[in-house]
Amino acid sequence: SKTADNVVAVPEGEVLSIPMPPGTNDLRHEIELVACLGRGGRNLTLEEAQEAIWGWSVGIDFTVADQKLPSGGRDMMRSKVFERSAPVSFVKPAYRTPLPNPVDLWLYVNNQKRQAGSTSNLVLSPYEQIVELSRYFTLEPGDIIFTGTPNGSSTLAVGDMIDAGVNGIGSIKVKIVENA
């Protein structure tokens, strides 16, 4: 989960600066295809889930992997919810960009490939994920759903330049900077 203010749009060709969250030595990246809903609903069918998607985006889900609770478990709130932890590309309307199956995702750090994979390797397709989510809560127009990441998530450092994309959808660039 992310809060709305964690999401930030990255214009194509620009580089977004992301401050290293305080108190971490283990900031990680996850490239993901993002489904952007134009319609909501509850208990959607597969066909309704497909029709609910207004567009597609590229997203990076940043996670602080070393935030612990006093009891020893991972603090999921501080791990996932921090400034600019969910950069996304501008949305490509689904009617102009039909989602091929499968879709390839990739992420480079300092020009070295860290993640590469396909939506065919996800446990549930993006559409099936929307169906499943709608069983548990009402989806709303404007919701964005990060749909999963390939293997290869790794630790980032200040100064790292990340170039990530989803074939047919777009790409984004971000740089990890000192926290002011």
Predicted feature locations:
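Catalytic-pocket segment enriched in acidic/His residues
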Residues: 63-180
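A short secondary-structure junction signal
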Residues: 12-15, 22, 44-49, 67-72, ...
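RNA pseudouridine synthases
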Residues: 30-60
